[in-house]
From Swiss-Prot:
Residue numbers spanned by region Condensation 2: 1297-1706
Induction: Expression is repressed by iron.
GO cellular component terms listed in the entry, alphabetical order: cytoplasm
Metabolic or biological pathway, per its Swiss-Prot or TrEMBL entry: Siderophore biosynthesis
UniProt region (Adenylation), positions on chain: 640-1045
Name of the protein this chain belongs to: Nonribosomal peptide synthetase sidN
Organism: Epichloe festucae var. lolii (Neotyphodium lolii)
Residues annotated as domain Carrier: 65-141, 1178-1255, 1740-1813
Modified residues (O-(pantetheine 4'-phosphoryl)serine): 102, 1216, 1774
Effect of inactivating the gene: Leads to the accumulation of the intermediate N-5-trans-anhydromevalonyl-N-5-hydroxyornithine (trans-AMHO), displays sensitivity to oxidative stress and shows deficiencies in both polarized hyphal growth and sporulation. Changes its interaction with the plant Lolium perenne from mutually beneficial to antagonistic.
């Protein structure tokens, strides 16, 4: 009775939607200690004593006792779940009345399942009443047999095929189709191996038994089929697939009954266990990707690290969803504790088959097509026919925040029921949808809802299978709230019936390109998981360890808690909004739910704001409580300073900018300005003018300032008219403003049609000057109304007619005060600069900023300084510096163009920027200044110059325009309405306050000024967002108004003018567009004949372009201001319109503009649009036809499609999904293709070339193997004959060198033992004390015997260098042993490098150039210190791949394991020989490549070597994905960027550089395991002028050129030098690309014997850059070493520019190639070869003698040898130089091979010999070989002559040669580091020690030991070397 009475009262007093559903009388409310209601206790009472009257119309009907007795079990189950008394239920009671939601349905279905009823949670939800539910339970179902029948048919079809394909017994496996969810994830993972993997980690206490953990996992994996699942692509079964039974899918799940668990245990020394786990995950990801998921994609890892143990599960999402994971870990915990499983669970075969039975694929496809097709954008261009490079799909990093919903679960459930929903899902769908539509500014959005399919069948609850699915949620924001919720309720139920669609189907329906995310947002509603045995688990899970990357911007997770609470978690792309904005978004979502609850169900969206908190709406409240009391006139501050500081400068004009002289200026003080302004005012007043418009069109002069102020003092309105405007525009402004007077000069009104009422005064006319001088100078009394117009400024109009904006005196005064306070705050020094500071007046008079510049200067007592605008801009740094500018306002583009930096403006304290977006570079430069306050300024003319501003910091968003100023209030309203949008949502900015101008002149039709709720405001038309702190973010324009070069214009005005100027009727559309070829924006007008049919192909009418563009642009220049003249006027076939709105289709026009090249637009080339985009038409080759057949089998037949060799796969209909199938099918035809490789080669022709390239690589093998074998045999025979005087029995084989070996060894032989010891590397390793030294030696002996190259030495034979391979039994490693104290061990090892290198170089023809050194501490056994091992090896024996193989072999040999036999290098040498047989083809290719290249660029003088590195911000995965989509390799991308940046840095538009190739991509048997230096180095060319207009085109050219060059990669560099007649190096810079091998499992890798500590590489190039791609860390690192630059900053800048270009690529930008190289800064050109010295017949004796040696060596005739002709022409190259230099020495010329290479002509070599005094005369006796002096007798102090001063020479008593150790240390100290080898040994002197005696002792010691009296010097005779000089 009480409940009924309360209910009646509530119904009478409350609106219907606020009447509670349930009334429960209690004697009291339970409370806790804080007197709050104890909700937990209350719920217990409710559960025990719940009573209720149903709210249905039959609530009062009598309950049928017989029916209740019959169905008591049903009612009791409902009572147990719903907490309701059975006696209150009737058969007509609805489940929605009872609050049965999705969770309750699951619980009910589960209870019915336990009683044997087969009913799903969906069927429970589908029941309207209890009787409906009973009817469902009464039906006997045949589901079990149905799914088993389906599975049986599936197995019958697929199992034989799979068995045959895998050659496996069908009894050992079973199959099941994949779900939609699994298919989609597997396809995406094949595209990117890092996607859709999950990693979970748990901390294992010390009490956990690892063996039992493993047993538990084994038990679980044995009993759950999902953990035995691998995947088989259906594409393997080409023909059979079309006949398959069951659902179509990309993969088949294979349940392998014999699958073993992937378990590993790792002991890691690393301190970062997360990094170790990441390495484990990365290894599994790569392995699975490479093997196409042919084994179960999961692994358990136990990581033992220091004092903790971690258990990690890495698993692919195709095997596991969140609910299954909880069940899985519950079972593992149970198995660990009890050795049993808790329950029998539904397995994957049954689960997937049950789902398959439910759905009809055709019906589902039709349903989703109907639901989603309305969302297709009518302007979507898709990518099916596009060949343009795509932006890389961005991987999004989420930031997550959460809050507890204000309303409880029960409240929200009741709300959902009132709005027509059976669960919370439709309610949150609508709430989230509304927020998204507002954020994206769209009426419709599509997002995804992730739901568990376990609801569909009661048997699926707890199933061990991934049963999640993503359902599309199309949402349209229209109608009232109840309608929207109801439509989503219907969609939920329908989607359950039809099932989830394939992601590929959704993409096709929506016409989304492969680069677009399918869903921009994802929503999940779930119940907080209960403890499923978690208490049994003895381990604790880590939360949120790894960064997760996704492809959707928003994710909303709604969690229903067991305590009647709802937690809302929002994850957002962290680049999309700030954390504060994200928090506001979440609060607004919660507030929206509250507003739903407070409002009537039929309320519209706009009505909800009434229930929204103001702080969540976009209102920036005024910071000033009241409006300014406008008591001061605009001239107030001028008059004030004139009285208080009359001598201060007020205005200054620069009149002279000549040459290097200081800028000439003239100025007025405040007193003079004020008096002159008063004279002007009186002159006007005497003309009886008041409140009239007065025009000013003057130059930048002192009188102009006075006239502007004087007009305002006189109570009239200033009308600025820019002198450069067309006459028609000037005339219009005079007429429209009804100007009574116009101040002009320099005849700038000649030809202007003047209105009769306008009186023109020429300020330079003598009569005006005299009249002005007679006027009174006293101040004018200010008795004018505040709202009187101060100035009238015209802006552009959309109808072609400019609009005059009336700005009042009060507006201008308020502006001065508001901005004065801002500037005083951000730049407080401004308050101290009165009389000193200067405000630069740079703005045009057509721009209202020029008024702000003047009046803000006078606000602070500064001087307004100006001058001729172009002269100031011509050298802006000079302007700032010499004029002493302290304050300025500049558009950002001007800062970029002039390159102005803070250092150029030493006096500047304030810089205002606005009108354009600022570039990041400019922002960083200026915002980082401690002296200058950088402020972003915003304000339409209608709101008095500027109404909002914000300080710009280095990390600021440059779109932020700060906060409203003064008493301004900013409102952000929904466009076209007076309703505020939510904070963070886009809307139109509306300004209120004293800055809002009076209005427009003569334009009652003009929109903008408005009255809202009785308050005057201005609608700016700008679309903005208001952030959480009320700062405003500028997004763009809502209309056609844009800003060009900082000035606002309306695009419609430009279009209207063009239309009026055209001689024929045309339609015009004007847009502001970006072009992919440049970062510049263009104003573009599209024109078409009026009435042109809007159908057919939209095309550019290029034949009329030049005429129309030129004629109409010239006409515009006569009519429009310069900034309004279009850059291009493009004729097109018709103006495209949108189907939905009939508005101009701007996207289609933008797309067309992007297809036109800059050359075409500027008239520099013919049309590319109407040219065929492919090569001349030809028939497909047989291979191409074969490829096309396979492609059609994947994408379907289309007879209408014209297929050509250059047709792309995407044009043929292939998408990312179908490419997976295509890759598998092509593999069966012999193509080695991956999905990524297909995307890199997207044309039929390119795929055919891949096949041909594979074939050609086979064909490149010796076509005449016998001839090559014979040639090798002849080489061996001749070499053996020449070695008769040597012991030859120990030689195993003789072989030619590889091209790079030849160069390296020749360099070594020709340079002898010079100090650098080129191409010898020393690698130092630590040996653990436990390592046995003798075992190390034995291991190396085994490795040397097993490796040919380590048994190879080199000899010079005639014109070649050959390899001598020593027999295994004679190959003994050469060891050196060192010992020293622990502190000096490494120094001792380092000091012997030079000696070892000399030994290698000297004996390279006798002993393999490899040495082994062992350094151990004295008494190492007792000290337990580590020993050091050094491997010294010549580069001719290894590359980075082979040296790693050698070290691996050593590790194996040390453990006494048998070594794998390394393949012989003979097949590689034969392959090279076969490639070199066709020399003419190689010569033709390389000479063509170098054709036109100027080789005269002088080598840059070497600087000190600089080394630096930089890791790119973009990850390796991101870059590889980018390259995959833009048809380029990562190597080509970095190489092209390197070449371009280097060319720009060196100012060389035509650049040759070297590229290192691995040499292991050729088809040679055993090449991968060959321990040999397979690398090759080839030259590449970059020509900025011809290789492409954009960076992408340039990189593509570089890639294509490299691809072609690889065919000739083994061409020897000496041959190239000979063909090109180049004596010096072909290139001075080198690029190499290395991709590291994936890291090994740290569990499988043992501790290595050799632990590297130090290594070195010799640098023989001015610049060497290595790009290292590391999959283990997912990074790309650039490492470089150079002698090219003076400063490290220059080298760092080169890498920074490279990263900048790469980063721009990741953003989808394609920058234009900058071809402006200016002057040659770093290089100068040498004269052409042969003109260094004039050729003449006057040969010196020395030159004649050298010529005779050349003739004797080459066989040339004496008259054929020229003085300056390079030696290369006579066959003297890097190899033959060795013999030539020997011949020279035999003839008395002491020169080395290196001397000849450095001086490669007769004239140069003669000069060198004369300079170094190395000529000893011609030796008549061949026995006199002019050998190097030997013996101490030849070492006299005379050798120092010329090297030291005479004074020093007199002090020297002896000269001696240095030991190798001394020479090495001195060289290193001089060349590398002056502190090297300098040691300081301090001693403590005991008390009483005599300092004099100490000094005497040292003096005697120095006198006794000459080493303490030795200095070191470099001499050049008889060869360059270091010597020691002993002093007296």
């Amino acid at each position: 009775l009480v409940a009924q009475a309360v209910k009646r009262h509530a119904t009478a007093e409350l609106p219907r939607h606020m009447v509670p559903d349930v009334f429960m009388p209690l004697n009291c409310l339970p409370r806790n200690q804080s007197s709050k209601v104890n909700r937990k206790r209350l719920l217990e009472v409710v559960g025990r004593e719940w009573s209720m009257q149903p709210m249905s119309p039959v609530a009062d009907e009598q309950v049928d006792p017989a029916w209740c007795i019959k169905h008591r079990p049903l009612l009791e189950k409902i009572q147990g779940v719903i907490k309701i008394m059975p006696k209150t239920l009737s058969r007509s009671t609805t489940l929605s009345e009872l609050g049965v939601d999705s969770i309750g349905a699951i619980r009910l279905s589960s209870r019915f399942k336990n009683d044997g009823h087969d009913i799903s949670a969906i069927q429970v939800l589908d029941s309207v009443t209890i009787e409906d539910l009973n009817n469902h339970l009464s039906v006997k179902r045949q589901g079990t047999s149905n799914w088993k029948t389906l599975l049986s048919r599936y197995l019958d079809h697929w199992k034989p095929l799979v068995s045959r394909h895998l050659a496996r017994d069908p009894a050992h496996f079973s199959l099941v189709p994949t779900t939609v969810f699994q298919d989609g994830m597997l396809v995406e993972t094949l595209r990117d191996p890092m996607l859709y993997w999950a990693s979970y980690s748990w901390r294992l206490p010390s009490t956990v038994d690892i063996a039992r953990v493993r047993q538990a996992w084994q038990h679980v994996s044995k009993n759950h089929d999902i953990l035995k699942v691998s995947f088989v692509p259906t594409a393997y079964f080409e023909q059979e697939e079309t006949q398959s039974s069951g659902p179509s899918s990309m993969f088949i799940q294979l349940i392998d009954y014999n699958a073993s668990m992937d378990w590993q245990e790792i002991v890691s020394d690393s301190g970062d266990w997360q990094q170790s786990i990441q390495a484990v995950c990365a290894n599994l990801q790569r392995t699975q990707h490479e093997n196409n998921f042919s084994s179960p994609p999961w692994r358990v890892t136990i990581l033992a690290q220091q004092d903790q143990r971690i258990m990690n599960l890495t698993i692919h999402h195709s095997l596991c969803d969140g609910e299954m994971l909880r069940s899985l870990m519950h079972d593992v915990a149970w198995a660990y504790s009890t050795a049993e499983l808790p329950v029998k669970r539904c397995q994957v075969q049954e689960a997937v088959s049950r789902l398959a039975v439910r759905y009809s694929e055709p019906e589902g496809h039709k349903f989703w097509g109907d639901m989603l097709s309305p969302l297709v954008s009518q302007t979507s261009l898709g990518d099916a026919t596009s060949n343009s490079p795509k932006a890389v799909v961005r991987k999004i990093r989420h930031r997550t925040t959460e809050l507890q919903a204000t309303r409880s679960t029960s409240k929200l459930t009741g709300l959902a029921r009132r709005l027509g929903a059976s669960s919370l899902s439709p309610l949150f769908r609508v709430t989230f949808g509304i927020m998204l539509t507002e954020y994206y500014e769209q009426q419709s959005v599509l997002f995804g809802e992730v739901r568990s399919e376990r609801l569909l069948e009661s048997q699926l609850v707890g199933a061990m299978a991934p049963l999640s699915a993503t359902y599309p949620v199309p949402f349209r924001s229209s109608g009232n709230i109840k309608d929207m919720v109801h439509s989503q309720q219907i969609l939920v139920m329908d989607s359950i019936r039809y099932g989830p669609p394939q992601p590929s189907d959704v993409r096709k329906i929506l016409k989304k390109s492969r680069d677009e995310a399918l869903y921009s947002a994802v929503y999940v509603l779930r119940q907080r998981p209960e403890d499923d045995g978690g208490s049994l688990a003895p381990w604790e899970e880590f939360k949120d360890i790894f960064e997760i990357f996704v492809d959707h911007e928003f994710a909303l997770n709604v969690l229903e808690g067991a305590d009647d609470t709802v937690t809302i978690s929002l994850s957002v792309d962290e680049t999309l909004m700030s954390s504060s904005a994200q928090a506001i978004f979440l609060q607004q979502l919660d507030a929206l739910l509250i507003a739903f609850d407070k409002s009537a169900p039929e309320i519209s969206l706009s009505g909800l704001n009434a229930h929204f908190p103001l702080d969540l709406l976009s209102i920036a409240s005024s910071k000033v409580s009241a409006q300014y009391t406008s008591t001061v006139p605009p001239s107030h501050y001028i008059e004030t300073w004139a009285k208080t500081h009359p001598e201060w400068k007020a205005v200054e004009v620069a009149t002279g900018f000549l040459g290097s002289q200081k800028i000439v200026t003239e100025d007025w003080t405040y007193k003079k300005l004020n008096e002159t302004a008063n004279q002007v005012a009186n002159l006007i007043i005497h003309a009886s003018l008041h409140g009239r418009a007065i025009a000013v069109s003057l130059d930048r002069s002192l009188i102009a300032f006075a006239i502007i102020v004087g007009i305002m003092k006189s109570g009239n309105t200033y009308v600025p008219i820019e002198a450069g405007l067309p006459n028609d525009r000037k005339s219009f402004l005079l007429r429209d403003s009804r100007a009574a007077m116009a101040f002009v000069c320099d005849n700038n009104f000649d030809g202007v049609e003047l209105p009769p009422e306008t009186k023109v005064l020429d300020t330079k006319n003598q009569s005006f000057i005299e009249n002005l001088s007679t006027q009174d100078t006293s101040d004018i009394l200010n008795n004018y109304p505040e709202n009187l117009d101060a100035y009238l400024l015209y802006t552009s109009g959309s109808t072609g007619t400019p609009k005059g904006v009336r700005v009042s005196r009060h507006n201008l005064s308020s502006f001065s005060d508001a901005w004065g306070k801002l500037i005083g705050n951000v730049a407080p020094k401004s308050l101290e600069l009165g009389g000193v500071g200067k405000f630069l007046c740079l703005a045009s008079r057509a721009f209202d900023v020029h008024i702000g510049e003047m009046f803000l200067a006078w606000r602070f007592g500064l001087c307004a300084v100006t001058g001729e605008r172009l002269s100031m801009l011509d050298d802006l740094p000079r302007t700032f510096r010499e004029l002493g500018v302290t304050h300025a306002g500049i558009v950002p583009s001007l800062l970029d163009q002039t390159g102005l930096v803070p250092e150029d403006a030493p006096h500047l304290v304030y810089l205002g920027v606005g009108g354009e977006k600022m570039t990041p570079r400019t922002q960083q430069i200026w915002s980082s200044s401690d002296r200058v306050a950088l402020v972003n300024v915003y304000g339409p003319t209608e709101v008095t110059i500027g109404c909002s501003a914000g300080r710009i910091l280095p990390d600021s968003d440059t779109r932020c325009i700060g906060h409203p100023l003064g008493d301004s209030v900013a409102h952000v309203l929904a466009p076209g309405s007076n309703e505020h949008v939510k904070k963070g949502m886009a809307g139109e900015l509306v300004i209120e306050g004293s800055l809002v101008a009076n209005g427009y002149l003569n334009r009652p039709d003009a929109k903008g000024f408005c009255d809202i709720n009785g308050r005057k405001m201005y609608r700016t038309g700008d679309i903005v967002r208001m952030d959480a702190d009320s700062s405003i973010l500028f997004l763009g324009r809502k209309d056609e108004q844009v800003k060009v070069r900082g000035q606002r214009l309306e695009l419609g005005e430009v279009s209207e003018v063009i239309r009026s100027l055209s001689p024929t009727d045309i339609d015009v559309v004007t847009l502001l567009l970006n072009h992919p070829g440049t970062s510049k924006q263009f104003l573009v007008s599209f024109v078409a004949s009026s009435g042109a049919a809007v159908r057919g192909e939209l095309r550019w009418i290029n034949e009329n372009y030049k005429e129309i563009n030129n004629s109409l642009r010239q006409a515009c220049e006569q009519t429009l201001p310069a900034y309004m003249v279009p850059d291009f006027i493009i004729p097109i076939s018709f103006i495209p319109l949108r189907d939905t709105s009939a508005k101009t289709d701007a996207k289609a026009l933008e797309h067309m503009f992007h297809t036109l090249s800059l050359g075409e637009l500027f008239g520099e080339s013919s049309s590319l649009v109407n040219k065929p985009t492919t090569a001349p038409s030809r028939d497909l080759t047989s291979i191409e036809k074969q490829i096309l057949t396979v492609v059609k089998s994947v994408v379907g037949q289309d007879d209408k499609r014209d297929t050509r060799p250059r047709s792309t796969l995407f044009q043929l209909g292939l998408d990312s999904i179908a490419s997976v199938k295509l890759s598998f099918k092509l593999k069966k035809l012999g193509f080695s293709t991956t999905v990524a490789r297909l995307l890199q080669n997207p044309t039929i022709e390119e795929l055919g070339r891949m096949k041909n390239a594979l074939k050609e690589s086979h064909d490149a093998e010796p076509s005449n193997s016998e001839s090559i074998t014979t040639r090798f045999e002849e080489l061996e025979k001749k070499t053996m004959n020449s070695l008769k005087d040597r012991e030859t029995t120990h030689i195993e084989s003789i072989r030619p060198c590889m091209p790079l070996q030849e160069v390296l060894v020749a360099h070594t032989m020709s340079h002898g033992s010079e100090a650098d010891n080129a191409y010898v590397s020393h690698m130092i390793f630590e040996l653990d004390p436990a390592v046995v030294v003798e075992h190390v030696k034995a291991a190396w002996a085994a490795v040397v015997k097993n490796t040919e190259l380590l048994r190879t030495c080199f000899i010079d034979r005639e014109n070649d260098i050959v390899q001598l391979v020593i027999k295994e039994n004679h190959a003994t490693p050469v060891w050196k042993h060192l010992s020293n104290g622990t502190n000096m061990l490494k120094e001792e090892l380092l000091s012997c490098k030079k000696e070892i290198a000399d030994d290698i170089v000297t004996n390279i023809d006798k002993s393999p150039p490899v040495r082994f050194t062992l350094a151990s501490c004295d008494g190492a056994d007792e000290t337990n210190e580590m020993s050091l091992f050094m491997l010294s090896i010549h580069h001719a024996l290894y590359d980075m791949v082979s040296i790693e193989m050698i070290f691996q072999d050593f590790e194996v040999a040390y453990t006494d394991s048998s070594l794998p036999r390394r393949p012989s290098t003979l097949p590689l040498l034969e392959h090279i020989a076969a490639q070199q047989q066709n020399e003419s083809k190689a010569k033709s290719y390389w000479t063509t490549l170098f054709d036109g290249y100027d080789h005269r660029i002088e080598k840059i003088s070497p600087r000190t070597a600089q080394t630096t590195a930089r890791t790119l911000n973009a990850s390796l995965t991101t870059l590889e994905s980018l390259c995959s989509q833009t048809n380029m390799t990562l190597s080509a991308l970095i190489q092209g960027v390197f070449a371009y940046v280097l060319a720009r840095t060196l100012k060389r538009p035509d650049l040759i550089f070297g590229v290192v190739l691995s040499g292991r991509s050729i088809d040679v048997e055993g090449i991968d395991a060959m321990a040999a230096p397979c690398i090759s180095t080839i030259p590449q060319r970059l020509n900025i002028g011809t290789d492409g207009e954009t960076i992408a085109e340039l990189i593509t050219t570089v890639q294509d050129r490299l691809f072609k060059s690889m065919e000739y990669q083994y061409t020897s560099l000496r041959s190239l030098s000979r063909w090109l007649e180049i004596s010096g190096p072909l290139f001075s810079s080198l690029f190499s690309f290395t991709k590291l091998s994936p890291p090994e499992d740290s569990g499988s890798s043992k501790s290595r014997i050799l632990k590297p500590t130090e290594g070195e590489m010799f640098l023989d190039f001015e610049l060497a850059l290595e790009c290292e791609a590391d999959p283990g860390t997912d990074t790309v690192t650039l490492r470089t070493r150079s002698t090219m630059f003076d400063k490290m900053e220059e080298l760092d800048a080169l890498l920074e520019q490279m990263e900048s270009l790469v980063t721009s690529f990741t953003r989808g930008e394609n920058k234009a190639v900058d071809g402006d190289f200016g002057s040659m800064l770093h290089t100068r050109l040498l004269p052409p070869h042969g003109s260094l010295q004039e050729e003449s017949d006057d040969w010196s004796v020395l030159e004649q003698q050298i010529r005779d040696v050349v003739v004797a060596f080459s066989g040339a005739l004496p008259n054929e040898v020229k003085r300056t002709t390079p030696f290369i022409k006579y066959g003297i190259d890097s190899i033959t130089t060795i013999r030539f230099s020997t011949l020279l020495r035999k003839n008395g010329f002491w020169v080395s091979g290196a001397d000849v290479l450095r001086n490669p002509s007769v004239a140069k070599l003669a000069t060198h010999i004369q300079t170094t005094s190395s000529f000893n005369g011609t030796a008549k006796d061949s026995d006199n070989e002019a050998s190097e002096p030997a013996g101490i007798g030849n070492w006299s102090k005379a050798l120092l002559a010329g090297a030291v001063s005479t004074k020093v020479l007199d002090d020297v008593v002896a000269v001696y040669p240095l030991t190798p150790l001394q020479a090495g240390m001195i060289s290193a100290t001089v060349m590398m580091d002056p502190t090297l080898y300098a040691h300081h040994h301090p001693f403590r002197l005991p008390q009483g020690t005599s300092i004099d005696q100490v000094r005497s002792a040292w003096s005697r010691l120095v006198a006794k030991h000459d080493i303490l009296r030795t200095s070191f010097h470099e001499i050049n005779q008889p060869r360059p070397q270091l010597v020691g000089a002993v002093h007296q």
